[in-house]
Amino acid sequence: MGFCRSALHPLSLLVQAIMLAMTLALGTLPAFLPCELQPHGLVNCNWLFLKSVPHFSMAAPRGNVTSLSLSSNRIHHLHDSDFAHLPSLRHLNLKWNCPPVGLSPMHFPCHMTIEPSTFLAVPTLEELNLSYNNIMTVPALPKSLISLSLSHTNILMLDSASLAGLHALRFLFMDGNCYYKNPCRQALEVAPGALLGLGNLTHLSLKYNNLTVVPRNLPSSLEYLLLSYNRIVKLAPEDLANLTALRVLDVGGNCRRCDHAPNPCMECPRHFPQLHPDTFSHLSRLEGLVLKDSSLSWLNASWFRGLGNLRVLDLSENFLYKCITKTKAFQGLTQLRKLNLSFNYQKRVSFAHLSLAPSFGSLVALKELDMHGIFFRSLDETTLRPLARLPMLQTLRLQMNFINQAQLGIFRAFPGLRYVDLSDNRISGASELTATMGEADGGEKVWLQPGDLAPAPVDTPSSEDFRPNCSTLNFTLDLSRNNLVTVQPEMFAQLSHLQCLRLSHNCISQAVNGSQFLPLTGLQVLDLSHNKLDLYHEHSFTELPRLEALDLSYNSQPFGMQGVGHNFSFVAHLRTLRHLSLAHNNIHSQVSQQLCSTSLRALDFSGNALGHMWAEGDLYLHFFQGLSGLIWLDLSQNRLHTLLPQTLRNLPKSLQVLRLRDNYLAFFKWWSLHFLPKLEVLDLAGNQLKALTNGSLPAGTRLRRLDVSCNSISFVAPGFFSKAKELRELNLSANALKTVDHSWFGPLASALQILDVSANPLHCACGAAFMDFLLEVQAAVPGLPSRVKCGSPGQLQGLSIFAQDLRLCLDEALSWDCFALSLLAVALGLGVPMLHHLCGWDLWYCFHLCLAWLPWRGRQSGRDEDALPYDAFVVFDKTQSAVADWVYNELRGQLEECRGRWALRLCLEERDWLPGKTLFENLWASVYGSRKTLFVLAHTDRVSGLLRASFLLAQQRLLEDRKDVVVLVILSPDGRRSRYVRLRQRLCRQSVLLWPHQPSGQRSFWAQLGMALTRDNHHFYNRNFCQGPTAE
């Protein structure tokens, strides 16, 4: 026995060595399975549902790993040796592995255990993120740590021992350890001097921790201190003592304004907050101060004394609606760049007018002013007069103020203004404002309803990625989501320098004729999406000589009016137009037969009905041919079922990008791409392609990117991509591919930069050919270890293709099949000769004797004799056109054409009755020559003529042959009221079928009807009432 063991051990070692050699010869697996190696030494293990830290193989270049991300897994225990094998690790992300109960999506209890030397074993670690984990104490940390995040944990105590020795620490984040989503019975406790030993700490964030005082003895090196949304309602100079290096201080949300709170809120106590006049006076280096949501109703000028370097001041969500008309607190803030005063409204009040305090004029360095949500109804030159003298003001936000009267010409007086946002107001047109309107501190007030304070709707998807970005232009005016019904030239008087105008989401329903924008001679970008424009005039928009981008998307209402024509000839007159969007207008007919432009480079025509237009013969076949310089064309969501070669032939030859996403294309003539010699990008995602056949990509094509994702592709012809020598990016994701073959690509495979095959049901059989190919091009396959998954066999479904090495695995099913076949062959080889020799004649006699007694043998001859020419005789009232149409188009098609080899033979009066015979002879032959008689009825209350005669013959057959051959199909819901129908439903329910009026039920109806016509009604009778007719 010992000898056998000693002999087998070297043999097993030899087998293992051979297997290892085969593995190395077949190709190299991804180094960091199941994770993915990304640029700059990052190993990404996010969202892999890991329960432990993966230990990578010795062959992996572990020394090159500088960042490891294990976010959003299920790791509950960290061992001492988990990261010791990564000697160069600098960044480690472990967030969202074991969240506290309140933050868990399913509120499951969880606790993370960290062994003492887990992080000490990584002496190079610089950044550690333990946020969103249920840990109670700060673990032991290496001295090399620079950034530490312990936010949204259950750590409620910080003392000098917690962070001892972390002299290199510069960033410490401990937000959300005690608040309404992560509740606790106490506040975060920071012992005095607990952080004093962190001599290099520059960033400290303690937001959402129920703190009532500023932690004492903070390190003097702090530059950023974030204490917002705690309960600190008193601030004095000693609270921020020694923090002379502070650059950013956030103490907002500590004494909240609850009428505007989007989450649970505690009202600020009366006569609070209390800020000492000298609270910030010693912070001479302060650049950013946040006092938002602090229930401030006035500003003390001494608060800002000594803050000569202040650049950003956030005073939003307070009660400063009157203060900003009188305050002198801004006089010394000469370096202020950004000021936020949004949502400083008086509860339930809208002021008639607002005049800013003269002290705003001293903000000579101000670049951005946010004043949305203050609620005043008129805007004129007196409103913003102090701002007109500010040379550096670039951005002014005035949205959501209920402004209904606005003099837009006042912005000409602002020398450096680049962006004005007046969206989400109630501006309805040009207005003449008087100078006697009420002021914010004592004028006319309108009480608001609660619904008026609802947030603005989120923008729907538009052509933002299509048109040029207005941020690069000199002056932009946003008037979207107002109450504009018409556009008048007077609105834009003195705005000739305006370059970008947004008028989307209004109610503009006029016919533009070339006079609406006359003053805007410098306009380059015009957004008129989500309106109701009538494009009828030939000279629309021709008053804009510099217009480059025009967005007319989502103006579908005029195009839906029957009989009204629409004129696109204005496009030819816009000599500088380069970008045009006509998307989502449901354009389908009665428009210009051709678009013409020599300057247009990009056209968005998605969301229309081009499939209907091209179905109208040659009327719109040349619709895009006049766009001689077009480069980018989007025809997505145009209900295209086919794309014929002559259609591509009539597209502009200059096209480089063609998008055909989300149509109904089931096939594509790939050879027709040679009609577009400059095409580089083709997007066919979201169609109904079943296979990539019909030839291959043509030779000489310049196609660089092809997207056929989200189709139903299950087959690709060999060599399909091989002729496209310049193809570099190919997206085959979300299809029905079971393999990926090297023969599809040929020599092109090595040149691919992106090959996306994720979300395909790959068949992970042993020796799968696609494994070797994907390993060859693994650098081009995004998410290869985690996103490329098996679809079959069942035990590997949904798992990574690397769940086991498919090149070396043993196919158990095949092994069992081979064993069974070999066993059967041996048994037959031994048994058959032996039985033949011993009792051959007896076996032959018994075989034929049993064969003669088999039941089906006796029935076969009778069945041939009783064979009938038809399976069913269909009887219906021909005078009812709807019933006749249903029979000929629906019933006949489903039973004779759609059932394949199981098709039924129907007898129809107008098709199968023999001429020359009498009506009764044909009727008799049809009833007695069919297995069933099918009555199709719209109503059952009045049955006569052929229907009545056929029913009487069927009943006669019941009496003579004792065979019930009646099957009823009732098309109207009222038909079931007949007493006969109700009685028959009770006795033989499956022979009475009701046509479903919901499409979802029609498939079941045809299945039930097929069963009723192929089986004897005797089997359908309810045995509780009767046994049904039986033959004697």
UniProtKB/Swiss-Prot annotation:
The Gene Ontology biological process annotation of the record reads: canonical NF-kappaB signal transduction; cellular response to chloroquine; cellular response to lipopolysaccharide; cellular response to metal ion; defense response to bacterium; defense response to Gram-negative bacterium; defense response to virus; detection of molecule of bacterial origin
Q: Where is the lipid attached (S-palmitoyl cysteine)?
A: 258, 265
Where does the signal peptide begin and end? 1-25
**Its membrane topology:** Single-pass type I membrane protein
- Residues where DNA binds: 47-51, 72-77, 95-109, 132, 179-181, 208
The ranges of the LRR repeats are 62-85, 87-110, 122-147, 150-166, 167-190, 198-221, 223-242, 243-268, 283-306, 308-332, 333-356, 363-386, 390-413, 415-440, 470-494, 496-519, 520-543, 545-572, 574-598, 600-622, 627-650, 652-675, 676-699, 701-723, 724-747, 749-772
Enumerate the spans annotated as TIR domain. 868-1013
Disulfide pairs here are 35-45, 98-110, 178-184, 255-268, 258-265, 470-500, 764-790, 766-809
According to the record, glycans are attached at 64, 129, 200, 210, 242, 300, 340, 469, 474, 513, 567, 694, 731
Q: InterPro entries given for it?
A: Leu-rich_rpt, Leu-rich_rpt_typical-subtyp, LRR_12, LRR_dom_sf, TIR_dom, Toll_tir_struct_dom_sf
User: What is the tissue specificity?
Assistant: Highly expressed in spleen, lymph node, tonsil and peripheral blood leukocytes, especially in plasmacytoid pre-dendritic cells. Levels are much lower in monocytes and CD11c+ immature dendritic cells. Also detected in lung and liver.
Task: Provide the Gene Ontology terms for cellular component.
Answer: apical plasma membrane; basolateral plasma membrane; cytoplasm; early endosome membrane; early phagosome; endolysosome; endolysosome membrane; endoplasmic reticulum
Please give the Gene Ontology molecular function terms for this protein: interleukin-1 receptor binding; pattern recognition receptor activity; protein homodimerization activity; siRNA binding; unmethylated CpG binding
Origin superkingdom: Eukaryota
PTM remark: Activated by proteolytic cleavage of the flexible loop between repeats LRR14 and LRR15 within the ectodomain. Cleavage requires UNC93B1. Proteolytically processed by first removing the majority of the ectodomain by either asparagine endopeptidase (AEP) or a cathepsin followed by a trimming event that is solely cathepsin mediated and required for optimal receptor signaling.
UniProt keyword list? Cytoplasmic vesicle, Disulfide bond, Endoplasmic reticulum, Endosome, Glycoprotein, Golgi apparatus, Immunity, Inflammatory response, Innate immunity, Leucine-rich repeat, Lipoprotein, Lysosome, Membrane, Palmitate, Receptor, Repeat, Signal, Transmembrane, Transmembrane helix
Q: Which residues lie on this side of the membrane: Cytoplasmic?
A: 840-1032
Which residue spans traverse the membrane?
819-839
Quaternary state and interactors: Monomer and homodimer. Exists as a monomer in the absence of unmethylated cytidine-phosphate-guanosine (CpG) ligand. Proteolytic processing of an insertion loop (Z-loop) is required for homodimerization upon binding to the unmethylated CpG ligand leading to its activation. Interacts with MYD88 via their respective TIR domains. Interacts with BTK. Interacts (via transmembrane domain) with UNC93B1. Interacts with CD300LH; the interaction may promote full activation of TLR9-triggered innate responses.
Recorded protein name is Toll-like receptor 9
